[in-house]
Amino acid sequence: MESLKCYRERFKGVFTDFISLKVSKKPVFDSQNYLVYGANNEVSKKEFVPREDDFCAIPILNDRDEAIISIAERMRHDDLSHSRWALGIITGNNAKVLKDRPKKDLEPIFTGKDIGKYSLKPASRYIKFNRADFQQCAKDEFYRAKEKLVYKFVSSRLCFTYDDTQSLFLNSANILIPEVDGMSIKTVLAFLNSSLFNFLYVKRFGDLKILRGNLSALPFPKIDAETDRKLSALVDEALKGNGNAVAAIDKVIFELYQFDTEEIRIIQEL
């Protein structure tokens, strides 16, 4: 790869950005240098290190973005690659299976639209849970887990919440039962909903869907037991709708990484 140019203009009826890429047939080395021509005609020289887990993604980052990501990566201690994951239910026929009102033998089922950060709207759909009727359904142990995280699948930003009601979810929501060294499930939730992790996800991947492979690549730091307890307690408050707790979670995480004022501004303004 020799150069990459970003364009300010967009094609009519198309909402995504577009680029031109100049490549040449040469041997691939451990790292590659290339030029990036920005939409405002600025030029910068970048280095790209090909790795299998990058899925050939070429991040377009400025120096401050790269510095923030580098700080997070240096503090990497664990990730979600060994956690447990499940998809929401695919009924195969929502119009037939989903009901608008509760009735005997029906239970609430939630969708991705019901999920907010640290919140879950009241269910507006109900279903009879009979896995033989569904096109695809995860094991009961995921839906009925004592604690689980659920997240909006179709989204450009991370949006997770906590469920301890053994509720059902449709396939517009996915399920995560995290296993991160030294962190409770609620502390993992704090990081996933933080401004920092949203920044890392958007800058590194920029997808319109929240993919398991991308989430598994996010770097979790090593924390002590006191920080784990503090973040878990703040999540309890955030789940009650306390907006101050959400800001306090970000503050704890920023202090953990020792970001300066300018770095915090960049992260929060995304």
Protein language model features and the residues they cover:
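Signature of N6-adenine DNA methyltransferases within the class I
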Residues: 1-98, 169-173, 180, 185, ...
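Conserved short secondary-structure elements within globular domains
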Residues: 1-6, 193-201
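Short helix/loop capping segments that flank catalytic or ligand/cofactor-binding pockets
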Residues: 31-32, 118-121, 159-162, 185-186, ...
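Low-complexity, glycine/alanine/valine/leucine- and proline-rich hydrophobic stretches
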Residues: 165-167, 188, 192-193
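Non-catalytic DNA-recognition/assembly elements of restriction-modification systems
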Residues: 48-93, 106, 112-113, 222-270
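Polyanion-binding catalytic cores of nucleic-acid enzymes and NTP/SAM-utilizing transferases
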Residues: 57-168, 172-177
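Proline-centric
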Residues: 27, 173-185, 198-243, 254-260
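Conserved hydrophobic/aromatic beta-strand scaffold that supports enzyme active sites
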Residues: 18-22, 109, 150, 175, ...
